[in-house]
């Protein structure tokens, strides 16, 4: 509505993979207090979230759901994440709102403004997992997988700790209640269940289409 909410200065990092095939590429914005304006964007940007301070945000033009890519709809990823939040599922979503991006004062396109989940501020706000100090025993452990798995926080212990837990789960039957309770005490099994539920629900039309092809 033309009302200035907040302003600041910061840096930009590359974000995404598929989106970099287009002019409207994805990027991360990082507000820098050192630049003398502000340490964070201070506003409740996402209507379904109470959080009102953001140092890092994602801006992307729907990635491979872009208008020019195979009948792209430009809203599907944001829709699924918003649906998950509305349903109260136990998964981490990139909160979504639409925005307009201008590059050097020129209109650049319709973008998505998204909450960044692999961010210490996100983990602190929603899970009370503060950064503390690097390499401390309580430092955040965070793995990210896209093609391969890499450690974003908590090196060198994060990957070995995950591998140890994963191998224990694979080596012990989860049908055993005692084993399952041990796993549940260390892993949010409800989050995994909800993740599969929403994926099944969203892809069911594609599944029916594939079955139809097989039957024909």
Q: Which ranges hold each PLM region?
A:
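Conserved NTP-binding catalytic cores of kinases and kinase-like/nucleotidyltransferase enzymes
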Residues: 1-71
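Short, flexible loop/turn elements at secondary-structure junctions
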Residues: 1-2, 14-16, 31-35, 61-63, ...
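Extracellular structured ligand-interaction cores
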Residues: 7-9, 24-26, 54-56, 81, ...
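ATP-dependent phospho-/nucleotidyl transfer catalytic cores
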Residues: 39-72, 112-204
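Aromatic- and charge-enriched substrate-recognition/interaction segments
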Residues: 72, 81-88
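Solvent-exposed, polar/charged alpha-helical surfaces in well-ordered, non-transmembrane soluble domains
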Residues: 78-82, 163
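Short, well-structured beta-strand/strand-turn elements
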Residues: 86-100
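Zinc-dependent metallopeptidase catalytic helix centered on the HExxH motif
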Residues: 104, 207-216
